[in-house]
């Protein structure tokens, strides 16, 4: 494949001076005012495209990511930038009878909780093939679960503009429902279980208290549908992604706008914070994965590799390893800090809806429309930037 670097006759490490020098040399040779060849217009158009892309730092970063999108490595053998990584499929859990939409580990006991389209919530010991407990939630349609501790799980779901919330403690369920007034497009529960955020097709972010459903605030800064939500691990920041190709960060308690990120080129499909909220991973319809610095909003890395849009993202506790699940049925693992693909895991022939890591980092779990929960053991090095 001929790259833009090949067109200009420079190597991928070329700096601005090298690019300008190469462009001047080629323009003197191929410009239509100088070169009588009928194809000189075509040659010069390709030279202009190459130069304009590579001289722009953001566009060059995206281009570099696109041409390296198929480079996935194992065990760091192929590239000095790739961190050691070992992963082994341990279990296929098949007790769910309908698509699985949400997974959550309990941070205190490492028990896994899953929920499916039929509102069944299962508790799993990761080393056992059958659920250790189950409970069916009544009313509504569960979209997300969050394990708060070894005794409490909260869940949320929506149907058109109706939102349902459940709190399940020792198999005793309490719930509330509200009519939102807007068609709900996405939902997310705070890690501490104190609140839930909902995005609407009419551009709104609504945040409600988990206890009783009291409205905390509504924000209308987006100019198109809110399509993705994420909370920071400490429940202090909410990220909203939108069809307006922006991401906004909000103070979860007050609703104050903290940061607006404009470096996304298309509709946002998934968002995830890294541990300690250093990075924000953003997936978009253009099949890109972008890593932003949360404090500054600056673009850190761009990665490509998926063939269909990403539905779900999760960071490993080590802070550098990122998992993405997509509609093509695979999970890809990335070094988010280095911007390279680590591994491609073909999992299903149906979309992956949810992916997560265990709090100790020893397990990766994914599930989706094929009703199967897949659990891998994983060994990854600690962060070392």
For each predicted feature, which ranges?
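N-terminal J-domain/J-like co-chaperone modules of DnaJ/Hsp40 proteins
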Residues: 1-34, 46-50, 54, 83-89
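WD40/WD-repeat beta-propeller blade N-cap
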Residues: 94-100, 136-142, 178-184, 220-226, ...
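WD40-repeat beta-propellers
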Residues: 103, 121-125, 163-167, 205-208, ...
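Residue-level detector of Asp-centered blade-edge/turn motifs that repeat once per structural unit
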Residues: 107-108, 149-150, 191-192, 233-234, ...
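Hydrophobic beta-strand positions that form the internal "hydrophobic ladder"
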Residues: 112, 153-154, 196, 238, ...
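Conserved strand-to-loop turn within each blade of WD40 beta-propeller repeats
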Residues: 115-118, 157-160, 199-202, 240-244, ...
